[in-house]
Design a protein with these regions (language model features):
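Amphipathic alpha-helical dimerization/coiled-coil segments
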Residues: 1-5, 23, 76-100
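N-terminal helix-turn-helix DNA-binding core of bacterial DNA-binding proteins
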Residues: 4-45, 68-80
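Amphipathic alpha-helical interaction segments
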Residues: 18, 56-57, 80, 85
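Single-residue recognition of alpha-helix boundary sites
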Residues: 29, 60, 85-87
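Alpha-helical residues within the helix-turn-helix
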Residues: 37, 54-55
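Short, hydrophobic-biased segments on the C-terminal half of alpha helices
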Residues: 50-51
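Beta-hairpin "wing" of winged helix-turn-helix
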Residues: 55-71
Length: 100
């Protein structure tokens, strides 16, 4: 069962649009509209790819704390595949963050 789950997650990530979604969410939670703007995907294409990522256990949807009508997408960081994959397309290799 674990192998099937891992295979499902890797298959979900084997598509450039879905990797772009994961990379965008690596920087923080986004609403579907914000995510569409950031990745340049139409709403119907984005909905399809989010469905695939959600069914693979890589992305979760949560309601806004302040306004229950709005939803946000977040990465399932507890999934080791997300932790190993997310953000690789965000910053060039060797980039560093300095806190002052």
């Amino acid at each position: 069962m674990i192998e099937a789950s891992r295979a499902h997650a890797h298959a979900a990530l084997a598509e450039p649009h879905r990797l772009a979604i994961v990379d965008a969410l690596a920087l923080g939670d986004l609403s579907p509209g914000e995510l569409g703007e950031r990745t340049g995907q139409s709403s119907n294409l984005l909905a399809h790819h989010l469905g695939v990522l959600e069914s693979a256990g890589l992305v979760r949807r949560r309601r806004s704390d302040g306004d229950g009508r709005r939803s946000y997408l977040t990465l399932a960081w507890e999934n080791p595949i997300v932790a190993a994959t997310a953000g690789h397309g965000v910053a060039p290799h060797g980039a560093r963050v300095v806190f002052v």
